Amino acid sequence: VNVDIDLAWILEVARRAGQGDPAIDDYGVAVAAVERHRAVLVGQDVYQGVYAKAAALAHSLGRMRWLERSNLRVAVAVAHAYLIASGAPAKLDQRRVSALATELRKESCTAAGVAEVLRSWAV
């Protein structure tokens, strides 16, 4: 099940994951993440499937600085919450969190690379 999330949803996940920490520096990044996961080109979803959509969200939120300090933590939390809301299996532990954070820190990071990491979260 693909879940269509909005800005309020991302901000709520950010509030919870950032433990009240994230001061938002750029709302435009979160708005762009929402629109990116919904992207359609010639009648086809640009990001097909829940892992690709979660990856588009995490890539946008984790690669572009939009919060004062909690960008990676929130990107991980948004990806996980999106997968769970979509009914996809997604087991989270320190190893999996670290793998996603490592991927997001790479200069060569792509949404496809993030999706590959997220697929490894399947239980």
Task: Give the location of each predicted region.
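FIC/Doc superfamily catalytic core
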Residues: 1-123
